[in-house]
Regions:
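RNase H-like DDE/DDD metal-dependent nuclease/strand-transfer catalytic core used by mobile genetic elements
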Residues: 2-106, 110-112, 117, 209, ...
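C-terminal, beta-rich DNA-binding module of retroviral/retroelements integrases
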Residues: 119-223
Length: 223
C-alpha cells in the first residue's frame, strides 16, 4: 500500500454496489490496477447484509476477477483510510462546497476539471512538495482494458483479507460469521484470510501465528 496521493474520482447517480464496481473499473482504467484495494466495512463495498456472511458483492467480485486483494479495515477505525479521508476533505472544501451544480452531468464535467487541476498543482507534505502527477509519473502501470466489464458472479480465485481487533470477549466478527479464540489471543490485531477457492478462513496474528482455521462458506451469487 502507498500513502502517496493520485486522484481519480467518479460521480455516481447513487452509491449502490453495481455503480461502485463500475466506478472502480473507470478509475483503474486511468491509474492502473492495484495489487490491494482497501475498503471500510460498509455493505456497499462488502456486499450482502449481515448476518448473511456467505454473500459478497460486485466490488469484491471485480477485485477478485482482476487479481486484486480486497482488504477490509477494522470496524470503526476510519483513520486506516487516512489518505482517502484527507483527499475527501480537500475535494469537499476546495471544490464541492464552492460550486453550484445544475445536474449530475454538470458535476461530472466540473469534477473532471478539478481532478486534473488537483493532480497537476496540489502539493502534499507526504510528497515532499511534489504534485501527484510528479509523484506518479513513472508509477502508473497495468492499465485496465477499456472493454472490461465487472463480473456478475463471485469468481473462485485469490483471497479476501479482513483485519480485526480482538477484544476481551474473544470474538471476531467476519460480516456476521463469528469466530471465538482463546483468552490469550485477545487485545491484538489479526488478519482473517478468506481463501475463496477452498472456502476456508485462517486467522493470523501480526507475528504470523495461525490462531484459527475453519470453513467459510461462500455463495457465487452477488448481493
Amino acid at each position: 500500500m502507498s500513502d502517496h496521493i493520485w486522484s481519480a474520482t467518479a460521480s455516481l447517480p447513487n452509491s449502490r454496489p453495481p455503480p461502485l464496481a463500475s466506478s472502480l473499473v473507470g478509475i483503474w482504467s486511468t491509474v492502473g490496477v492495484p495489487k490491494v484495494a482497501q475498503f471500510d466495512n460498509h455493505a456497499n463495498f462488502r456486499g450482502g447484509i449481515q448476518p448473511v456472511y456467505q454473500h459478497f458483492g460486485p466490488v469484491v467480485a471485480t477485485c477478485l476477477d482482476l487479481g486484486v486483494t480486497p482488504r477490509f479495515i477494522p470496524v470503526a477505525e476510519p483513520w486506516r483510510n487516512g489518505v482517502i479521508e484527507h483527499f475527501n476533505d480537500v475535494w469537499d472544501k476546495s471544490f464541492f462546497r464552492n460550486e453550484t451544480f445544475t445536474s449530475l452531468d454538470h458535476l461530472r464535467t466540473e469534477n473532471t476539471a478539478f481532478i486534473e487541476f488537483h493532480n497537476a498543482y496540489h502539493r502534499y507534505s507526504a510528497h515532499e512538495g511534489a504534485t501527484p502527477d510528479q509523484m506518479w509519473k513513472y508509477r502508473l502501470c497495468k492499465p485496465l482494458s477499456a472493454g472490461y466489464r465487472p463480473p456478475t458472479r463471485l469468481l473462485t480465485q485469490t483471497r479476501i483479507e479482513v483485519v480485526r481487533y480482538i477484544r476481551s470477549n474473544r470474538h471476531i466478527d467476519l460480516f456476521g460469521k463469528g469466530i471465538t479464540v482463546t483468552e490469550d489471543q485477545t487485545h491484538q490485531y489479526v488478519t482473517a484470510i478468506i481463501k475463496v477457492r477452498s472456502k476456508k478462513v485462517i486467522v493470523i496474528t501480526l507475528d504470523g501465528e495461525i490462531i484459527h482455521q475453519g470453513d467459510f462458506n461462500l455463495s457465487p451469487v452477488l448481493r
